[in-house]
Design a protein with these regions (language model features):
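Juxtamembrane helix-loop-helix connectors linking adjacent transmembrane helices
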Residues: 38-74
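Function-critical hydrophobic alpha-helical transmembrane segments in multi-pass membrane proteins
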Residues: 60-93, 97-100, 109-113
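Membrane-water interface at transmembrane helix exits
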Residues: 39-43, 47, 79-87, 129, ...
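Residue-level signature of transmembrane alpha-helical entry/exit and packing/kink sites
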Residues: 24, 60-68, 118, 137-138
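Early transmembrane hairpin module of multi-pass membrane proteins
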Residues: 1-41
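Hydrophobic alpha-helical membrane-embedded segments
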Residues: 1, 35-39, 71-82, 142, ...
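Cytosolic/stromal cytosol-facing helical appendages immediately following the last transmembrane segment
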Residues: 1-18, 89-220
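Hydrophobic alpha-helical transmembrane segments of multi-pass integral membrane proteins
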Residues: 29-44, 70, 121-127
Length: 220
């Protein structure tokens, strides 16, 4: 159930240390975890100093559950539009290319990004600085943004125990983005790719439609 049969790259100079896994670990820790820690520190510093207002579950249980419902919508919408931004040629060439070298993805590929991309990508939880929520919601939001990509980039469609499927694994929708680049900018929590005509379902027809769309964009 692996999307691509080949293993992660070794002896390939386009990756740091000529090793894709080591490269991904480096960028995930040096860039991803650093930005993650920075945003978390800002949030908790704001609370400790009375700058950031919160709304606890005890005081607003309805609001708490509304946040739970809205998190995938907020994250999905934010991801689609910042991802389109990162495919602007200048940002792609100097920033997003660090992540896109991973055509064959693995768990460490998820937040293996240039620091500028991690600053942009991980910024959706900052909404909680401006709109009060329970700190647990902020923590959950940040976990979704930082740890979920390890799962969706795993490269395996399913996790199985012998013949029994335990759960679905990597996101085929996003796997196609790493293969074709100019499609599937978001996720299916919010079907913006469908609405904006950038959806690819893996079929030959979708590939032809994508190429026609890109050809048309290039001639404008």
């Amino acid at each position: 159930f692996k999307f691509l049969k080949k293993e992660m790259a070794k002896n390939n100079k386009k990756f740091k240390f000529s090793n894709q896994v080591y490269d991904n670990i480096f960028w995930s820790v040096f860039s991803g975890v650093t930005i993650w820690t920075f945003y978390e520190a800002i949030y908790w510093y704001g609370i400790a100093n009375g700058i950031v207002k919160t709304s606890s579950f005890q005081s607003s249980p309805v609001q708490f559950f509304l946040w739970i419902i809205c998190l995938p919508l907020i994250r999905g919408t934010h991801f689609y539009f910042i991802h389109r931004l990162l495919h602007v040629p200048f940002l792609y060439k100097h920033v997003h290319v660090t992540h896109h070298r991973n055509v064959n993805t693995g768990p460490w590929s998820g937040i293996s990004m240039h620091p500028v991309e991690n600053i942009i990508y991980q910024s959706s939880p900052l909404i909680h600085i401006f709109i009060p929520s329970d700190p647990m919601i902020f923590t959950l939001h940040l976990i979704l943004v930082t740890l979920n990509p390890a799962f969706t980039h795993s490269g395996f469609e399913q996790i199985k125990n012998k013949k029994t499927k335990l759960l679905d694994s990597a996101d085929f929708h996003h796997q196609l983005h790493h293969r074709y680049f100019d499609c599937n900018y978001g996720n299916m929590d919010v079907p913006l790719d469908v609405w904006f005509g950038t959806h690819h379902d893996g079929s030959e027809e979708a590939t032809k439609a994508m190429r026609l769309r890109m050809k048309g964009a290039a001639t404008k």
